[in-house]
C-alpha cells in the first residue's frame, strides 16, 4: 500500500503514468487495500500510481449464477475477490422467422447454424466450476461497500502442468520491484511550485488554471459541497493563495493591486470553465450563477436512474437498453440544456460503479 502521507496526483496528470491505462497485474490482497481517489470515483492508487483496471489469475472458490452474469470468487493465495462476468447475449438470427424457405439461401442457413454453435461454445466457456483456474481483466468497482472486479475479459485457463501459474509467480515480483513499487514521480516542470519552491517563481496562466481547478476539486470533495457561487470560492484563503501567484503571460494594467485582483477573478473563472468542460460541475438553467457539483447532485443521479428504468420497460429499449444520447435528451428535457455529455458520463459512471445500471454494449445501458 502507498503511504498515507503520499499526496494524490492531480487527475490531469494521470495520463503521464503508463500504468493508468494498462491492466495492472496486482496481488488480490493489494487490490482490496488500494486507496480510492478523492477526485474521481472508481480510480484507485498504489504508491502514487493511478489504477483503473487490473489483471488477476487465480482459482475459483465460489460460483453464483444470476440471469445476466456469473459472480466468481477468485483466490490467488493472497486474498479472495468477487468478479462479475457477464453472460453473452444470444445472437440474432440472420434469417427472420417469417421468411419463406425458398427465399433463404443456403449460405444464410449455414451462417445461422454457425452463429448458434459459436454461441453455445461461448456459453460453455463462460461457465466455470469451483477449482477451475480463471484469468480476469476488468475494472475495479465498489458494490455495497465490497470491492469487486467487473470483467471486460475472462476465460478458463487450461494449465495442467501449471506453466502459466508458475510464469505468473515469477512475473509479479519482477513487476512490483521494477514498476509498481517505484512511486510515480511528476515531472519537475509540472510540480506545484508552492511546495518547496520560492514565491517569486513564475508560472504560465494555463498551468495556474489547471492547478487551481485540481485544488477546487479537492476542496469541493473534502467539504462535500453541493453547490456554490464563484465569489464563495474567491473567499477561500488556500485557493486565493494559488490564484494570486505571479503569472508570466498575464497582461498587466495600471496598478499592481488592480492587476492582481483582475488576475484572481480571471483565473477562478477559467478554472471553473475547465471543471464545466470536464463535467465535474454544471449549471441549471434557472440560476446561471450557481454551480452544481455533479457527484453531490443526488437528484440528477436519481433522475437519470429513473429514466433508464422506465424506458427499459418499453419494448423499444427492452433488449439493448437505452442509448447514451437518448438518456441525455431525456435528462435535458427535465433539467435543462446545460447538462453536458461530460456531466452525464460522470453520472452514468457513478451509477454503473454502484451497480445500479449495467452496460449491455457500448453506449447502451439498462437497469435491474
Swiss-Prot record:
By its UniProt entry, which InterPro entries does this protein fall under? CST_STN1_C, CST_Stn1_wHTH1_sf, NA-bd_OB-fold, RFA2-like, Stn1, Stn1_N, WH-like_DNA-bd_sf, WH_DNA-bd_sf
Q: Which GO terms describe its molecular function?
A: single-stranded telomeric DNA binding
List the CDD domains hit by this protein, alphabetically.
hOBFC1_like
| A Pfam cross-reference name | Stn1
Which residues lie within the region annotated Winged helix-turn-helix (wHTH) 1?
193-295
Residues annotated as DNA-binding are 54-157
Residue ranges of the region described as Winged helix-turn-helix (wHTH) 2: 296-368
Q: Which GO terms describe its biological process?
A: telomere capping; telomere maintenance; telomere maintenance via telomere lengthening
Query: Which compartment or compartments is the protein found in?
Result: Nucleus; Chromosome, Telomere
Q: Which Gene3D superfamilies match?
A: CST, Suppressor of Cdc13 homolog, complex subunit STN1, N-terminal domain (1.10.10.980), Nucleic acid-binding proteins (2.40.50.140), Winged helix-like DNA-binding domain superfamily/Winged helix DNA-binding domain (1.10.10.10)
What's a GO cellular component annotated to this UniProt protein?
CST complex
Protein's UniProt keywords contain Protein transport: no
- Write out the entry's keywords from A to Z: Chromosome, DNA-binding, Nucleus, Telomere
Q: Which family does it belong to?
A: Belongs to the CTC1 family.
Describe the subunit structure.
Answer: Component of the CST complex.
Q: Give the function comment from the record.
A: Component of the CST complex proposed to act as a specialized replication factor promoting DNA replication under conditions of replication stress or natural replication barriers such as the telomere duplex. The CST complex binds single-stranded DNA with high affinity in a sequence-independent manner, while isolated subunits bind DNA with low affinity by themselves. Initially the CST complex has been proposed to protect telomeres from DNA degradation. However, the CST complex has been shown to be involved in several aspects of telomere replication.
- Protein name, as recorded: CST complex subunit STN1
From the UniProt record, report the name of the gene that encodes this protein.
stn1
